[in-house]
Amino acid sequence: MPPSPLDDRVVVALSRPVRPQDLNLCLDSSYLGSASPGSGSHAPVLATAVVTLKAANLTYMPSSSGSARSLNCGCSSTSCCTVATYDKDHQAQTQAIAAGTATTAIGTSTTCPANQMVNNNENTGSVLSPSGGVGSPVSGTPKQLASIKIIYPNDLAKKMTKCSKSHLPSQGPVIIDCRPFMEYNKSHIQGAVHINCADKISRRRLQQGKITVLDLISCREGKDSFKRIFSKEIIVYDENTNEPSRVTPSQPLHIVLESLKREGKEPLVLKGGLSSFKQNHGNLCDNSLQLQECREVGGGASAASSMLPQSVPTTPDIENAELTPILPFLFLGNEQDAQDLDTMQRLNIGYVINVTTHLPLYHYEKGLFNYKRLPATDSNKQNLRQYFEEAFEFIEEAHQCGKGLLIHCQAGVSRSATIVIAYLMKHTRMTMTDAYKFVKGKRPIISPNLNFMGQLLEFEEDLNNGVTPRILTPKLMGMETVV
């Protein structure tokens, strides 16, 4: 009786979903020579198979019981890995030996002659191509990045200048900055949105597939917010990348491009990054508040460097960020700051806005603070703008009572920062970009998600059109800085 097909099965665990044709995979059937029709041998075929797979986290699980084997990678998610199964059809053993046929579990088959098979010790040679023939080995860079196109600095500058002259900035391309936050804060292309995927938390969430760039704006609310601009070009840049195909998977640029491609977008990469763009188009770049102030007083680069810390971290230290005074009466912080009773009393804080759905109202039972909860999540589905006016009124109440107000979320990075930016836009003539810069200058770790940035853009448009009135008197204390 011939062995069951289930007795010769290879199960491969992949770290993320891929298509079988994306795999550099062939079965080593050199051992089949002893069982070829011309040899006259009827020795049974060994129930083993060798797989060459250029992917991490490979698990080889031959079935020995004749029934399908399950694979458990140890995590709690059913979608964290994709299982691909490759069988040899023992019922058609003679044909398989002659043609070297391998049938995949998804019902497709490809032929690979025995003399073209590769084994685990070979890194070069012929492999199965997506079309079923023999092609070239797959490179280390994912195929979806090989099709990424580039845009030259001069071409981007022309697009930006054209939109500026036509007074239609919303018609311009979406520009995404993938560099570390501190570098973005020093200098970036005008209008560029920073994607904070350089820190460990964001990088891990992106790599695990918990969030992606477009996941943040893929919901109905996010799409409505970015409908004007995300239907246009998306341009991504880092410091100095020239060829996106050479970017390694660990680089933020790679992560962002991969996410955009998965969502069906066709992003362009700025050739040479910011370094190349600034050489001829420095007038289209924005700098941090400190650098601008130094140039205004004629201090030059040496004065700017003297004002910056001697040891500047490459990424913001979110976990160790301290309570930040944005205005004399308005403080932006995180969960730990909301628990620090001594500091809150020392700063004369009497009002607290909790912009979360799950964190408790710390010290509520003591009756020392007036609390307001804005139940919001830091996600692509959250409409945060619906709470703007409610938050503004509560902040004004604290201001009129001569008390300080702490607004916080989990980390003081996205939700609470968005409301503070909106408050400054409401009570000054600041643009969204100026208010964003002002808050970032005080608290460098802030990074509202793209969904919230879209809501801020819409809020700015309503302020400019008079749909939402500004409140310019009395003038806010602490806003003497020219932004």
From Swiss-Prot:
Enumerate the UniProt keywords alphabetically: Cytoplasm, Hydrolase, Nucleus, Protein phosphatase
Q: Domain named Tyrosine-protein phosphatase: which ranges?
A: 322-465
Q: Which CDD domains match?
A: DSP_DUSP10, DSP_MapKP
Q: Is Nucleus tagged as a keyword?
A: yes
Record GO biological process = negative regulation of epithelial cell migration; negative regulation of epithelial cell proliferation; negative regulation of epithelium regeneration; negative regulation of ERK1 and ERK2 cascade; negative regulation of JNK cascade; negative regulation of oligodendrocyte differentiation; negative regulation of p38MAPK cascade; negative regulation of respiratory burst involved in inflammatory response
Superkingdom is: Eukaryota
Q: Which InterPro entries match?
A: Dual-sp_phosphatase_cat-dom, MKP, Prot-tyrosine_phosphatase-like, Rhodanese-like_dom, Rhodanese-like_dom_sf, Tyr_Pase_AS, Tyr_Pase_dom, TYR_PHOSPHATASE_DUAL_dom
Q: Does the keyword Hydrolase apply?
A: yes
Catalytic activity field: O-phospho-L-tyrosyl-[protein] + H2O = L-tyrosyl-[protein] + phosphate; O-phospho-L-seryl-[protein] + H2O = L-seryl-[protein] + phosphate; O-phospho-L-threonyl-[protein] + H2O = L-threonyl-[protein] + phosphate
| Any GO MF annotation of the entry | MAP kinase phosphatase activity
GO CC annotations, alphabetized: cytosol; nucleoplasm
Read off the PROSITE patterns from this record.
RHODANESE_3, TYR_PHOSPHATASE_1, TYR_PHOSPHATASE_2, TYR_PHOSPHATASE_DUAL
* Protein family according to the UniProt entry: Belongs to the protein-tyrosine phosphatase family. Non-receptor class dual specificity subfamily.
| Record's function text | Protein phosphatase involved in the inactivation of MAP kinases. Has a specificity for the MAPK11/MAPK12/MAPK13/MAPK14 subfamily. It preferably dephosphorylates p38.
Q: What is this protein called?
A: Dual specificity protein phosphatase 10
Q: Which organism is it from?
A: Mus musculus
> Which lineage?
Eukaryota, Metazoa, Chordata, Craniata, Vertebrata
